[in-house]
Amino acid sequence: MHEHLKEKLAILPDQPGCYLMKDKQGTVIYVGKAKVLKNRVRSYFTGSHDGKTLRLVGEIVDFEYIVTSSNLEALILELNLIKKHDPKYNIQLKDDKTYPFIKITAEKQPRLLITRNVKKDKGKYFGPYPNAQSAHETKKLLDRMYPLRKCSNMPDKVCLYYHMGQCLAPCVKEVTEEQNKEIVDEIIKFLNGGHKEVRSELETKMYEASEKLEFERAKELRDQIAHIDAIMEKQKMIMSDLVDRDVFGYAVDKGWMCVQVFFVRKGKLIERDVSMFPIYDEPEEGFLTFIGQFYENSSHFKPKEIVVPGSIDSELVERFLEVEATQPKRGKKKDLVELANKNAKIALEEKFYLIERDEERTIKAVENLGEQLGIETPYRIEAFDNSNIQGTNPVSAMIAFIDGKPAKKEYRKYKIKTVQGPDDYESMREVVRRRYTRALKEGLPLPDLIIIDGGKGHLAAASDVLENELGLYIPMAGLVKDDKHKTSHLIIGDPPEPVMLERNSQEFYLLQRIQDEVHRFAITFHRQLHGKSVIQSALDDIPGIGDKRKKILLKHFGSLKKMKEASVTEFVEAGMPKNVAETIYSYLADKKTL
């Protein structure tokens, strides 16, 4: 331990606060909170720890701390510091883990949508639905039952939904505000838990249709009732008080924490959320950090009540989240907490079992591959693939597998710079040259095996650069595909000879994963570049659209198809002035221009 660390540890205060661990570059790598800073920070440098925590401690060369007046203030400060520094060892719930909502838009002719983006608009949002399939099934049922507008842009004539009885065709007919309000009120009633009432009304209509000999209509209503029954079956009543509550449970094992959240809505357990992450703190502190981040995410609406395990400071949770937080001692809520705890424990056990089994298989596959090729075990494998369509935007990609597993931080993308036109062999020469020239210059780790996605020509080009230009002698193999573009066999040696592997062997599956992954990485990069160029060229002739606005539109919509489907309002939401949004919409609506 550095001497200055010992000196700082000796004068730590016995007060609540936050601490920031730093590496040799001065980068904050971990942020924590403590009821007593002196005890918590010292604990990292004393006693025994698991390997994961030892890695963290091994990187710490300095720390700083901030004293707070209370545990609540420490929790709030910790969350803000994590957001500010994004430390690599902290829990960081990603913003992309959002749940879908069902939205009724506030348009003159409202629509029913699935969205993950909750906005402060006049629309009505229902959810979240942790199970996206459940959200889509519910919307599909509502679309059948209630004839709101379906099209994002008003067509010139009635569409199929009108003929199916699922739309009132406001595009060509007058649909009054009262008509829409009546439909919207029915949808709201259904989404607020009024399934039984809606079912009863449909049942009455079904019998009336049967009496009038309207058998098609009766069958349609019967199908709708069956769909409601299916939804209700998945949401059995478990609480009689109909209070919306989130029930939390957790388990900790081998330096990992699993938190399970049961979402109870209107007395029904509708779904659960499962999160697993490494933990470097006391379990209770890690849980509090998790729950703070969980509700900071805009997709998690706070219910009326939050139920937490007995080991958690419920008063702190209540003050921080400003909702009722309880620690049940008996009854149904306690049973649910214990069930959440049990599920969390089982999830961790399954995780470790699968990891252990997968690691054994993977390492064995790497060892077997080395034996089959007659080389040392290739613990580090690097693979290359080229991608171009009709000679446009030629690119190449390199991926790395370490101990048989993808090491995504090691992946590299290459735009082809020196080759004119679609020349796969010269492109391969260029990227191999660039990759290993840099590796030699910067002292980067070299692979035990290089895999080239291609045949003899690709292998010869890459080998020539590696050996004759760079003086490197690393085993290199070509990965040959069959006529269905599937992994067939390897070629290796000079001259290259085929190495046939058993198709059901672990080493063959490893090669398939490598080939699929390098192809995916290369083609994704190529499509990104190609998509950008297509969108940018398609927008070149629109007045008021320069490079800056092209980038904004590209980032917001991602594809020309989505832009063509967008409304004027959606272009405004993307940051376009209204007059520019109208110009873009008109331009893209004219199919002849594209």
Curated annotation (Swiss-Prot):
Signal peptide: none annotated. GO terms for molecular function: DNA binding; excinuclease ABC activity. InterPro entries: GIY-YIG_endonuc, GIY-YIG_endonuc_sf, GIY-YIG_UvrC_Cho, RuvA_2-like, UVR_dom, UVR_dom_sf, UvrABC_protein_C, UvrC. GO terms for biological process: nucleotide-excision repair; SOS response. It comes from the Bacteria. GO terms for cellular component: cytoplasm; excinuclease repair complex. Residues 196-231 form the UVR domain. Residues 14-91 form the GIY-YIG domain. It is found in: Cytoplasm. Keywords: Cytoplasm, DNA damage, DNA excision, DNA repair, Excision nuclease, SOS response. Pfam families: GIY-YIG (PF01541), UVR (PF02151), UvrC_RNaseH (PF22920), UvrC_RNaseH_dom (PF08459). Its main location: cytoplasm. The UvrABC repair system catalyzes the recognition and processing of DNA lesions. UvrC both incises the 5' and 3' sides of the lesion. The N-terminal half is responsible for the 3' incision and the C-terminal half is responsible for the 5' incision. Belongs to the UvrC family. PANTHER family: UVRABC SYSTEM PROTEIN C (PTHR30562:SF1), UVRC/OXIDOREDUCTASE (PTHR30562). Interacts with UvrB in an incision complex. This is UvrABC system protein C. The lineage of its organism: Bacteria, Bacillati, Bacillota, Bacilli, Bacillales. The gene is uvrC.
